[in-house]
């Protein structure tokens, strides 16, 4: 595979250990009435896109085909995706392209900081593709971005949504310790039984260790994780994962509905009702999470500023 070759859908997941059975459209579960996506046609939406293209930046909103892009861009917010738009993993739930990425762009931290300053954002989420090709998994680039954003917008709070730094955890954490964020987020995504199918190359206990070790070093910085429902898990398995997160000192939680980006991705096994999401939210608070956002359209960075406000991280 050459640098910049892009694989999506069936081509991306063809080498995964658990294959996705071909589906016709009549085999797909019908979306229920509570799954609604806002249209993308406001002036703010196009202004955000203009700034992103001028600064040659990527967002997970676009690359992962997030259903909330219309609402978030329409409000003038975005979740910035650094380190390129090609991921070294092949997760079959995700619409980000797989490929061999280019080296990190040394100008990206500055472009990111300038964009955030231009958008006058009080709260930003910075995420990345997986970069298994880099010795530190991209951790230094996260640090460079945090420093530039703080230099240009010292009042802006920064949440980072990091990959698992597989095989590079100690190096990555050492880098992050030099310039930590205001919120540390790493998604478990699903239950351990489904990791081989849903997160090939990832390890459940490794992800928990990442969250635990960061929290041990910075007890005053909130840690956060997210889960998707509809991949074949049971309610009790989700509750078990929530308990594991609390055992590893994670304080903030997001749970949302998995939506299949294309027929080349994992199918939706169930649509969870809004009432059931409310029950997970209630259970999360009872377990001791300081904040839990649970709902069909919730994503890890969706309304992250609101969640941070409710957790007392930012003031409005």
Swiss-Prot record:
One of its GO terms (molecular function) is 4 iron, 4 sulfur cluster binding. [4Fe-4S] cluster 1 binds at residues 61, 66, 72, 301. It catalyses: [[Fe-S] cluster scaffold protein carrying a second [4Fe-4S](2+) cluster] + N(6)-octanoyl-L-lysyl-[protein] + 2 oxidized [2Fe-2S]-[ferredoxin] + 2 S-adenosyl-L-methionine + 4 H(+) = [[Fe-S] cluster scaffold protein] + N(6)-[(R)-dihydrolipoyl]-L-lysyl-[protein] + 4 Fe(3+) + 2 hydrogen sulfide + 2 5'-deoxyadenosine + 2 L-methionine + 2 reduced [2Fe-2S]-[ferredoxin]. Its EC number is 2.8.1.8. It is found in: Cytoplasm. One of its GO terms (cellular component) is cytoplasm. CDD domains: Radical_SAM (cd01335). Keywords: 4Fe-4S, Cytoplasm, Iron, Iron-sulfur, Metal-binding, S-adenosyl-L-methionine, Transferase. Residues 73-290 form the Radical SAM core domain. Pfam families: LIAS_N, Radical_SAM. Its cofactor is [4Fe-4S] cluster. Its main location: cytoplasm. SMART domains: Elp3. Binds 2 [4Fe-4S] clusters per subunit. One cluster is coordinated with 3 cysteines and an exchangeable S-adenosyl-L-methionine. Belongs to the radical SAM superfamily. Lipoyl synthase family. HAMAP family: Lipoyl_synth (MF_00206). This is Lipoyl synthase. It comes from Nitrosospira multiformis (strain ATCC 25196 / NCIMB 11849 / C 71). The lineage of its organism: Bacteria, Pseudomonadati, Pseudomonadota, Betaproteobacteria, Nitrosomonadales.
């Amino acid at each position: 595979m050459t640098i910049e070759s892009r694989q999506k859908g069936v081509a991306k997941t063809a080498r995964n250990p658990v294959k996705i059975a071909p589906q016709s459209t009549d085999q797909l579960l019908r979306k229920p009435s509570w799954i609604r996506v806002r249209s993308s046609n406001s002036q703010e939406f196009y202004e955000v896109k203009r700034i992103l293209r001028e600064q040659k930046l990527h967002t997970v909103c676009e690359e992962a085909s997030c259903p909330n892009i219309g609402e978030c861009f329409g409000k003038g917010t975005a979740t910035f995706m650094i380190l390129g738009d090609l991921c070294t993993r092949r997760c079959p739930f995700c619409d980000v392209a797989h490929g061999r990425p280019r080296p990190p762009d040394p100008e990206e931290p500055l472009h990111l900081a300038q964009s955030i300053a231009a958008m006058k954002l009080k709260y930003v989420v910075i995420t990345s593709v997986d970069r298994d090709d880099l010795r530190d998994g991209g951790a230094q680039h996260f640090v460079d971005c945090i420093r530039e954003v703080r230099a240009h917008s010292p009042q802006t709070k920064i949440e980072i949504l990091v990959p698992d730094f597989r095989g590079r955890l100690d190096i990555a954490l050492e880098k992050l310790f030099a310039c930590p964020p205001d919120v540390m987020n790493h998604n478990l995504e699903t239950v351990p039984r489904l990791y081989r199918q849903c997160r090939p190359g990832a390890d459940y206990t490794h992800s928990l260790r990442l969250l635990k070790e960061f929290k041990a070093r910075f007890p005053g910085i909130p840690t956060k994780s997210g889960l998707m429902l509809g991949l074949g898990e049971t309610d009790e398995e989700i509750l078990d994962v929530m308990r594991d997160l609390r055992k590893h000192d994670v304080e903030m939680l997001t749970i949302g509905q998995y939506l299949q980006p294309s027929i080349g991705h994992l199918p939706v096994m169930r649509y969870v009702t809004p009432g059931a999401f409310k029950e997970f939210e209630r259970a999360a608070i009872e377990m001791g999470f300081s904040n839990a956002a649970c709902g069909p359209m919730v994503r890890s960075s969706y309304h992250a500023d609101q969640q941070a406000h409710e957790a007392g991280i930012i003031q409005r």
